[in-house]
């Protein structure tokens, strides 16, 4: 009996572990997090996008503190970022990063347009070495494209994530709550040469709580069959 219980527990653990290996996170900063969050949530394959703060030291992670005048040019200030949770089976990390780079101006230092200060810095906080390698490759490629169009050097900071702090509730889904809210476009208009496979997708139905969404697994899932009936 003990052996059967142990074997069953191991199978459950293995199935649970396997079912989440395609889910990853990346924390991205590209200026004001309101518009950035909206952009990620529109991508097919993005499970969640949460506005927050990261990469600060000696500064409390809340909006009031990071926007103090004394912290405007503080190199240790937190950056406005978005924690993006995505399904690798539906959107590649490369496509997600292409969207990130094309959606803002990474050549601006500590600002995006009229949003000026270290809180608006361009920053990528990766979760693993695989992400880091792809980021390095894409930044090199994008720099070449930007240079051809007369832009300067990319200022994006790249480092491993230490801690992400979720922003206050009123910042979450801000543009959805305030359709006419502040959402400037600071993108350069420079696009990657290859076709971008990222397409906007209406994920709003997933947040209504009235539908069951079944994502087909790569392995046999006896429970999934029940939902098809």
Segments predicted by a language model, with ranges:
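Short, intrinsically disordered, charge-balanced linker/junction segments flanking boundaries
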Residues: 220-229
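Short active-site neighborhood of thiol/selenol oxidoreductases, capturing the structured segment around
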Residues: 23-28, 207-219
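Flexible coil/turn and secondary-structure edge motifs
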Residues: 15-205, 225-226
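Bacterial N-terminal signal peptides
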Residues: 1-9
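Residues at alpha-helix boundaries and the short loops/turns that link adjacent helices
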Residues: 90, 218-221
């Amino acid at each position: 009996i003990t052996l059967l219980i142990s074997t069953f527990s191991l199978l459950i653990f293995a199935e649970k572990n396997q079912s989440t290996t395609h889910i990853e996170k990346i924390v991205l900063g590209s200026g004001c997090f309101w518009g950035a969050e909206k952009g990620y949530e529109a991508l097919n394959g993005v499970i969640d996008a949460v506005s927050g703060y990261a990469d600060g030291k000696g500064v409390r992670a809340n909006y009031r503190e990071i926007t103090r005048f004394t912290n405007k040019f503080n190199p240790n200030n937190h950056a406005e970022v978005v924690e993006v949770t995505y399904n690798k089976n539906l959107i590649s990390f490369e496509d997600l990063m292409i969207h990130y780079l094309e959606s803002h101006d990474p050549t601006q230092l500590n600002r995006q347009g009229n949003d000026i200060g270290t809180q608006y810095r361009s920053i990528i906080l990766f979760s693993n070495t695989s992400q880091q390698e792809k980021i390095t490759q894409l930044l090199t490629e994008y720099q070449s494209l930007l240079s051809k169009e007369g832009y300067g050097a990319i200022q994006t900071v790249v480092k491993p994530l230490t801690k992400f702090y979720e922003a206050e509730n009123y910042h979450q889904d801000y543009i959805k709550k305030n359709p006419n809210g502040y959402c400037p476009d600071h993108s350069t208009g420079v696009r990657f040469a290859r076709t971008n496979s990222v397409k906007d997708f209406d994920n709003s139905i997933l947040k209504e709580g009235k539908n069951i969404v079944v994502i087909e697994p790569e392995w046999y899932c006896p429970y999934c069959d029940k939902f098809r009936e």
